[in-house]
Amino acid sequence: MQKKLLLKLSVVFLLLLKLIPVRASVVDAKHALSFKQHIDTLQTGSSLYLVDENQFPIAGLKIVNTKTKKTAITDNNGIAELSYSTGDVIAVYVQQSLVLKTEMSKDRNVITVSSKNPGVAALRPVRTLFDQTVKSTLSTMATDVVYGSDLTKSPVTSVKAAITGRLSGMFTNQNSGRLGSEGRTDGTAALISLGSLGSDAVTMSLRGQNPVVIVDGIPRPLTIFNMEEIESVTVLKDAVSTAMLGVKGASGAILITTRRGTKAKQTISFTAQTAVQKLLKVPQGLNAFQYATLNNEARVNDGLAPAYTAADLQAYQNGSDPQGHPDVNWTDLVTKPTSRFNHYTLNVAGGNDFGKYFVAVEHINQNGLFRTSDINTYDTDNTFKSYVIRSNVDLQINKKLSGGINLMGRLINSNDPGYGSQAILNSIYATPANAYPVFNPNGSYATTSSYQNNIYAQSVGSGYIGTYKRDVSADLFLKRTFDEITKGLWLKAKASIYATLSENTYRNKSFASFFYNPTTKVYTQYGTIGTQNNYTGINYQGHSDYEELSLGYDRNFDKHGLSAVVLANHDNSFTGSDLPYTVQGISGKASYNYDEKYVAELAFGYNGSNYYPPAGDYKYGFFPAVAMAWNINKENFLKDSKWLNTLKLYGSYGKTGNDNPGYFVYIQRYFDGTSTYFGSTPGSNTSIFEQVLANPNITWEKANKFNLGLQGTILDNKLGFTVEYYRDKYYDLLMQRGKNSALIGQSYPLENIGQSRYTGWDFKLNFQQSLNDFSYYIAATGGLQQSKVLYQNEVNQPYPWMARTGQAVGQRFGYIAEGLFQNTSEIAGSAKLEGHTAQPGDIKYRDLNGDGIINQLDQTVIGNTKPLFYYGLNLGFQFKGFDFSALLQGALNRTIYLSNNTEWAFQNNGFGQAWEHNLDRWTPQTAATATMPRLSIGTNINNEATSTFWQHSGNYLRLKNIEVGYTIPNSLTKRIGLQSIRVFGNATNLLTFAAYDRVDPEVYNGNYPLQRSINMGINIKF
């Protein structure tokens, strides 16, 4: 089925590709002829095509032939009419600032300028909602953008991972290193109002919120992407930029714009990459001798007899009895030191006056971390394969009518051991080295009565589970201009469908492991040897349709500019067997500017969702926003400034909404309960219970958002800067009342009562300079963010330090640790935890209320209360054919909390693993240097209580990506008929500098480890 679908999609895309020149020659020969003349002109040295490194045409550049002194300005297609000859030097300017000089040849007609140059970047239009763009100087919005040429420098498939450290206001955190596990972020938004960031493998936060995702103007899931198909990723952060989203605008938006064709000769680009990946910061367990020694110590501490004799310890130490005294490194046995990653992409782009096209095909093949066995005829590794095809076609049907179609197909096949990848890792983290040998003398899987399992069998003897995922989408749009009515008037219609499916093929099986008694020679079986399953089950399926009709007007009257759009849209989505989720409404925006100096903008959204009550004012909402901008550099008092190129002050304020009600929570829902017997002739009747109480007055969440920004370029457009301050108040947040009573016998309903506030600063600095053949750039992004819970109907607390209200959103509470008890005298004079008899080496806690008892009344804010500061530094250079880039990314004022089986020793009633850091435990001999509390068997309620003891600094700086490349001279590649050849190598997660470096600052507590990737590749353009 997969191959057939892939074949059908390929045929459709190739037919569309083939259709363009045929249609142009048959239907519109005039357009085709004009394009041929244009190409001929380019080839004879009278026109130039200026693009950035993303092949995006740049309008408004001034080019000068330094020999003839003739000048020209590039049009909206990046084309400038200027004669030149071989050897002529062409100078490119932004305003009066020189960008570069380049020597021309007769067969060269394309000049590439760097979008890293702040002046060039300012010439690129700013992406807004619903496929609209606005000139950078006329934008009043808080936005930031990263282009595809930067995203391709990291061999990742997650957009969330690729944008890390590259966008101001955006903070990402990678919680897992597994490819393809980035989590499914759908097109909806969620306010992180009184909770945490979530559980995706890569979480993202835009000014503290989970943004809505929009792909080519349409709400879509953020799943696997081919980075080479992305033109840009833009974030919208303030009210005026997202007001048209209405009930989906409060959390900001991420706009992913895929690449499109241009009016240029067809270009074919092929990239092949191969990488070696290695796990980082894998928890290190103790060997058998260390484990047995510490286990004895823990048992003595708890008043128990030692479990291991001196003979046992000696056998573990010298390895004389591997069957009876095993020493198995389960991590090395089950996992591989490295895995392979292969990545291939093929892109075709081009166009003429009639049509433009871009087609991209991608294949990824990654091996996993688990070893396999020759006993199986199938793969038990956790592998990942994906196939992505995208086709974007734009048609200029006639002078007034244009349109296009976007098609996308994505297939993902992943494989896991039948026992489950994370489950096997959990077993490794919970099983000591001396638990049991791998095999018994007869070759069967070994175990003991205490474990009744075998990790190696979990890995290679449990079969496999295959996961198949499919995503298909199609977008169709038409645009008609009505200049015959009034110049600048247009009408656009858009329709889209999207379908997704995820299903598992279960070929897993149960296995048996055996305990061998060497004295009796008897094998005791645990588990059963089962036949391999053979069935499929759907994990997730859904589809959606989206329709939009917009009417716009764009026109300039002398020094007055007016732009307006109003649209109606309908978004309908289905998930599984649930009732459809529908959002619909109207929205609009109007912008006025005077001489491109003063700008005023109004935006609104009026929409609603069927998840809200139909009666009253709960279903639909009105969300307005207003903004202004002032291009200060155009004032007379700054016109002659030599150091200042551009300077814009802008601000916005507005009301936005968030659609987060849950599934029809305004309707009371019931479920079946237990059976009851009653009546003269007893009969069984099933009872019915209420679920959470319904709220018939539930409505959308809201936010009042304020933004003030300053943006400019200085020093001949070499240095650009953006600084923004924001203050966002979120209210009517859905939550259950803290002041509630159990007397009603049911959970309280969700109500619109919560309030929180997020304030902060975003900044971006970028510098670029060209010195003959050498150019370099440095770009810094970052944000300072602080949140506060304003109201949550919190129960009255007996002490002020217990109050959650007034603290940061998601703030952790616990005990304040004051070191370790050193002796019984210190214990006697200190407060003690309820239900626990303290011993020397236990953690000592601060008695905040002074009652001599440690309990919940002594829990307070723990962790860093300073504003979170996150940052990225992107730098690089080009010298002749060589290029280099690096991305550093990190965070400050951040804490991590360590717990669970990978932190505490001897969990699971004393049968769990112990770790290298447990060697630094407290003993009478190590009291002065110990960093860990005394050892215990099983759970120690005192030492494992939530406290500052297990909390550490999460500050870090990571060399996220580094790349070195070389482009072979064109004089050599053209001899073999190629446009260019570039070879490159890059690496991800190469170095990490962490304030607390025992664990990875992002991936810890037993999650799938982060991976370092060393990658080599080649790009060939035809």
Predicted regions and their residues:
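Short, acidic Ser/Thr/Gly-rich low-complexity loop/linker segments typical of extracellular
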Residues: 68-79
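Cleavable N-terminal targeting peptides that direct proteins into the secretory/outer-membrane pathway or into
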Residues: 1-44, 86, 99
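Extracellular/periplasmic, surface-exposed regions of secreted and cell-surface proteins
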Residues: 392, 396-401, 406-411, 417-421, ...
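Structural motif
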Residues: 36-38, 43-58, 221
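Short Pro-Gly-centered beta-turn/loop motif in secreted/extracellular proteins
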Residues: 55-56, 81-88
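Membrane-proximal, glycine/serine-rich, low-complexity loop/turn segments characteristic
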Residues: 24-41, 110, 120-124, 130-212, ...
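A short, solvent-exposed loop/turn motif at the edges and junctions
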Residues: 89-105, 116-118
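Extracytoplasmic gating/loop element in the C-terminal half of outer-membrane beta-barrel translocons
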Residues: 307, 432-441, 457, 838-840, ...
